[in-house]
Design a protein with these regions (language model features):
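Short histidine-centered beta-strand/loop micro-motifs
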Residues: 52-53, 61-66, 82, 88-89, ...
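A short, N-terminal "cap"/entry segment at the start of jelly-roll beta-barrel domains
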Residues: 1-48
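Short hydrophobic/aromatic-rich beta-strand segments that constitute the beta-sheet cores
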Residues: 63, 80, 114-116
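Short acidic-glycine-tyrosine-enriched beta hairpin
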Residues: 84-100
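Short, conserved beta-strand element in jelly-roll/cupin
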Residues: 56, 65-80
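Structural motif
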Residues: 60, 70, 77, 103, ...
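Conserved short histidine dyad/triad with adjacent acidic residue
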Residues: 39-41, 48-65, 99-100
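Ligand-binding loop in jelly-roll beta-barrel domains
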Residues: 100-123
Length: 123
């Protein structure tokens, strides 16, 4: 059995596009549209590890993370406000991780694109 040990993200989006809003995503303002290109997915020991490219157009949504995520913004402007916290303005080159249970508001000021790595645990 051959095991793929390296996944290189293409410079431009490739492959099928997934359109559903992420789990825990509630639109507050505008009509944000999301597109996801998943470049890697692997189930292991009851968890799904996935990575790819995610895009979201302007709008505001509340989000409660049901997964762990690392992301790196490639383009756009995001105002991320943790529940009970101060707004953070993020742009190209900024990166962050969020733990399961993180909640807050995402205001996409200018269409964003990010590389992501997520880890979902069944349950």
């Amino acid at each position: 059995m051959e095991q793929k040990l390296l996944t290189v993200f293409p410079r431009q989006e490739q492959g099928p596009v997934l359109h559903p809003h992420p789990r825990g995503f509630t639109v507050i303002a505008g009509q944000p549209v999301t597109r996801t290109w998943r470049y890697f997915a692997k189930e292991e020991e009851g968890a799904l590890l996935a990575s790819g490219l995610w895009e979201c157009t302007e709008g505001t949504f509340a989000f409660r993370f049901q997964h762990w995520e690392f992301f790196h913004l490639l383009s756009g402007v995001l105002r991320l406000t943790p529940e009970g916290g101060e707004p953070l303005l993020l742009g190209p080159g900024d990166a962050a991780t969020m733990e399961v249970g993180f909640s807050g508001t995402w205001e996409v000021v200018e269409t964003i694109r990010k590389h992501f790595v997520t880890r979902y645990v069944a349950g």
